[in-house]
């Protein structure tokens, strides 16, 4: 199941150590401060999802994994592969930092926000998810939270899997990890996924001409990694992956003109690293390169026709991070450099552009008696907007054994994307969007229930909005977000329960109107149990009311979208010690709902899959 953060500190063993759902030692996370540390020493709310969780849920997309997590609200323009957005604690989709193995997702650099509908679920071995500001560690984008997708496998062997389902869904996957001698490990993976999909547009809502077709999705993925331990403290790795996706979608149709309704995405990433893992000092140097080519075109004319568009971006990064144990805690420091380059025509920008950013940061964690203190500061020097600084601090007080109060404050920012700076309506004088956040939380273990309740406020200024009168982007928006988050997990006999509740009041601070596409309330519940070797799982999610715009006519009207309750049922059975079969019914009661106005969801879906390991 999802493993919620316990309160075990790195330097003392208290009653909190009983909170960890997995076995001791406490689960290690790397995302909070770039180095492995017990999850319980991170004062920000942190959730870890393992590959075992993903297999148990039988998720076929990254979005299906993330939608189950506290504070996450997913919207999507239809089914698999269709454009999606991630809202964390009511912030914008562009206020979520998505990392792949600790490196910023390349695709987010063009549009300003990450669309994880395109990222292959086959690559995901682990997800570390931190809520709240983290710009003081990572720089731009980390306003609402950080999602770190980790591709490294943690178990040797070979697995072959296949799956089939509704809308002609099919998936085939082969992966292997082999040990070469005592010090070298090789991992290889290949994956193929395809669905015919369904017609995503709900006609009459969008005003577009009917396009009665199936909006399908095809993805092909390759992955390889080589890891080597030179000595007991020195190690290195080389890793690469790529995917080739095709998505069909519904677009606005103009008679006599090409209908651009197909997306073709090529993406490849390569990284290499060297690590020193001493008893007191740790250091790592990581370099990476990624290249994406994103075509949108009419398949009757091809992706090289004048009607087609191409967004092409290359990203280069270098990260040097260091950590030293001092007293009852540690101090970390590092520098990272990033260069993003676009080809001419990307994001409708006539010329190609380079943007460089160099950041230096300092982090610290220290325990003093019943108190735990955490802090970080960072300075970024950007080739476009100059220097920008952020900082954050948190304190935890174990006022009674097994119970803790946490208070935190942090600043964060979001840099303008390349389209906002240099596009047809761009403004090269834009400043970063800025955020100030406060949070207070209580957490504890009561009668076997591991719980946390927190309240937060986030004031965002200098939001980049489009001005209809001047036809330019300006820093003129403000947002005020207030929220309450409650999480709990507990066991009752053979049943394991995980539940969360989110209340988010996200508003335009100038007009006092709700921000679009955010559900005001969400309830999420996961029930797992084993009966006669069958592993059962029930997932419940309530999505509250939200608002969106009807873009079928101008001026655009605000529409209210009602809430919905969704149920999933999953079951798995180990036929042998090597062969496991699984089945799932998503949207069990076939509820009709939308998360983006005018775009249909799939309705009830069935999947059947099997995996063989050796």
Swiss-Prot record:
It is found in: Cell outer membrane. Residues 1-20 form the signal peptide. CDD domains: ligand_gated_channel. One of its GO terms (biological process) is monoatomic ion transport. The chain crosses the membrane at residues 158-165, 169-178, 184-195, 217-227, 232-248, 263-277, 279-296, 309-325, 328-337, 353-369, 371-381, 385-400, 403-417, 434-443, 449-458, 473-490, 494-509, 517-529, 535-550, 558-572, 585-596, 602-614. It comes from the Bacteria. Keywords: Calcium, Cell outer membrane, Ion transport, Membrane, Metal-binding, Porin, Signal, TonB box, Transmembrane, Transmembrane beta strand, Transport. It is a multi-pass membrane protein. InterPro entries: B12_transptr_BtuB, Plug_dom, Plug_dom_sf, TonB-dep_rcpt-like, TonB-dep_rcpt_b-brl, TonB_box_CS, TonB_rcpt_b-brl_sf, TonB_rcpt_CS. Cyanocob(III)alamin binds at residues 83, 85, 92, 110-111, 251, 309, 517, 551. Residues 38-152 form the TBDR plug domain. A motif (TonB box) lies at residues 26-33. Ca(2+) 1 binds at residues 199, 211, 213, 215, 250. Gene3D superfamilies: TonB-dependent receptor, beta-barrel domain, TonB-dependent receptor, plug domain. The keyword Transferase does not apply. Ca(2+) 2 binds at residues 213, 215, 249-250, 261. Involved in the active translocation of vitamin B12 (cyanocobalamin) across the outer membrane to the periplasmic space. It derives its energy for transport by interacting with the trans-periplasmic membrane protein TonB. This is Vitamin B12 transporter BtuB. The gene is btuB.
